[in-house]
Amino acid sequence: MSASGPANYEYVVARIRHRRAGLFGDDEYRKLLRMGTGEIARFMEDSTYKDAVDSLASRHRGMDLVEYALNEGLAAEFDALLSWSEGRLYDQLAKYLRKFDAWNVKTVFRGLYSHADTDAIRADLVDAGEFDAAFLDELLSADSVETVVDALSGTIFDTYLEPAFADYEDEDSLVPLENAVDRAYYENLNPSQPATAAQDSPEALYAEFLTAEIDFRNARNALRLARSGVSVDPAAYFIEGGTLFEASEMTTLVERQSDLVSRIQDSTYGDELSTALTALEESDSLIGFEHALDRALLSYSDHLSYVYPTSVCPVLAYVLAKEREVDNIRAIARGREAGMSEDEIQAELVML
């Protein structure tokens, strides 16, 4: 593990190929759909989550055990990725994994806003970013959204959250804060590439991957704003670094959803997002659209991995795939706990 020296893409990609083959597939998900939470935890013991389940089983049971084991297993997996990585790859991966800092900040915001208890919020935190356990505990101990914003002073989220907090107070909506967190994360990834970089250079491939993710995030955020009715300036929460939209046109696109959908359809992502747009039009469901967006991003990341097999692309694609696995297992366990039908739970899963 070192941020200096040459990148060891070939070595890390070879190890990831083995790990990716062990991800849950359709057969595993079908089995989980018929299990209770206790059975799901036992099923996880026979998988890569064994160490996490074993270490937590004396303190937790049922749904709590599943939740904590998933997050601990995810954090351990990404710690391993970092430990294998060298040079530019280490730097690229470490920055990318800050997404879990963003996730944790938004999770604490949501918990405080909904008056959830501390244990419920803690169960959703993933210790895989740069924030250490002590700082996460500090965020968890906050008694208000404003206290969390103050605690984040000096982090990459600092300057983004200050103006967003005023909008949050005016609108009583988390949308401004969540969009500000996304902007802080993505814009600090520095996805732009030097003009002289070759198309298959490490800089260019990293930029291409992140540009697609930013474009998909802007599409998601634009539609959320269009549906939320919150009277904030959409351009103020636009994420720089994509190619799908310009900040100057966001207000018009958010106000006229048909124009927004047409823009996505006519873009370079039109084919990848056709299923997502169809889901949006047929069911008028933003959740369905967001799930389809997630599937499209997984597919696009796999495409980049196929075209550039010895690069950062397969590494970041594996991060996305592992995240989706955890999200799917959690959705199944929560659905079973809530008494949802198999079809209802199936609709919550993101699979290719």
Curated annotation (Swiss-Prot):
It comes from the Archaea. InterPro entries: ATPase_csu/dsu_sf, ATPase_V0-cplx_csu, ATPase_V0-cplx_csu/dsu, V-ATPase_V0D/AC39_subunit, V-type_ATPase_csu/dsu, V-type_ATPase_csu/dsu_dom_3. Keywords: ATP synthesis, Cell membrane, Hydrogen ion transport, Ion transport, Membrane, Transport. SUPFAM superfamilies: V-type ATP synthase subunit C. The keyword Secreted does not apply. It is found in: Cell membrane. GO terms for molecular function: ATP binding; proton-transporting ATP synthase activity, rotational mechanism; proton-transporting ATPase activity, rotational mechanism. GO terms for biological process: proton motive force-driven plasma membrane ATP synthesis. It is a peripheral membrane protein. The keyword Ion transport applies. Belongs to the V-ATPase V0D/AC39 subunit family. HAMAP family: ATP_synth_C_arch (MF_00314). Component of the A-type ATP synthase that produces ATP from ADP in the presence of a proton gradient across the membrane. This is A-type ATP synthase subunit C. The gene is atpC.
